[in-house]
A protein has these predicted regions:
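Active-site-proximal alpha-helix that buttresses catalytic centers in soluble enzyme cores
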Residues: 2-77, 81, 108, 119-125
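Active-site donor-binding loop signature of nucleotide-sugar glycosyltransferases
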Residues: 8, 77, 132, 152-153
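Short aromatic-enriched loop/helix-cap "lid" or pocket-rim segments at secondary-structure transitions
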Residues: 16-18, 86, 140-142
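Active-site catalytic microenvironments for nucleophilic, acid-base chemistry
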Residues: 39, 64, 68, 92, ...
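Short alpha-helix plus adjacent loop in nuclease-associated cores
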Residues: 80-90
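A polyampholytic, Gly/Pro-enriched intrinsically disordered region
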Residues: 92-105, 143-153
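Non-DNA-binding regulatory cores of transcription-related proteins
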Residues: 93-100, 106-125
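Domain-level recognition of soluble alpha/beta enzyme cores
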Residues: 118-148
């Protein structure tokens, strides 16, 4: 089992509606997506299941990276989810062998830290790939993951 975790790209500070859920990507976020597109094309398998929060910033991150080349499933419950909710979501994907989850801090970083057994702080556009050789989606637990890739966008702020 491989779990890829991606924090959404850089966003504008405020949305036109005043709602956090509606914040869109900033120009630097678009540049980060171009960088991530190259990286993810190299580290993700063809059959990767892609799940994303339905917030505007995660939706835009996913769509900029994958265009319409991959199926992306969006879920309201992934918006600002904590580690435990993310773990439950992943464990319910019994058929998956490889997952990419696009989400938010602090939950996405907490999940990465839990699986890898060390502190991982994903900045905007941050990505980590964690491998669980010989483990199924229902067997994932603390500190058993092996970090295969850890990327921080060169366009950070």
């Amino acid at each position: 089992m491989i779990v890829h975790l991606l924090r959404h790209a850089k966003t504008e500070v405020f949305s036109n509606t005043g709602k956090d859920f509606d914040r869109k990507l900033a120009p630097k976020g678009h540049q980060q997506c171009l960088e991530l597109k190259v990286l993810l094309s190299k580290v993700m398998g063809e059959e990767t299941n892609i799940f994303s929060s339905s917030a505007r910033r995660t939706r835009e991150t996913a769509q900029f990276i994958f265009d319409e080349q991959k199926e992306i499933l969006f879920f309201d419950e992934l918006y600002l989810s904590g580690k435990n909710d993310l773990m439950t979501f992943i464990s319910n994907r019994e058929e998956a062998k490889e997952i990419l989850m696009i989400g938010h801090n602090f939950g996405i970083s907490e999940l990465a830290s839990y699986y890898a057994g060390k502190q991982i702080l994903l900045k905007t556009g941050g990505f980590v790939s964690i491998d669980f050789p010989d483990f199924s989606v229902n067997e994932l637990s603390a500190s058993i993951g092996i970090i295969k890739a850890n990327h921080r966008c060169t366009i950070d702020y």
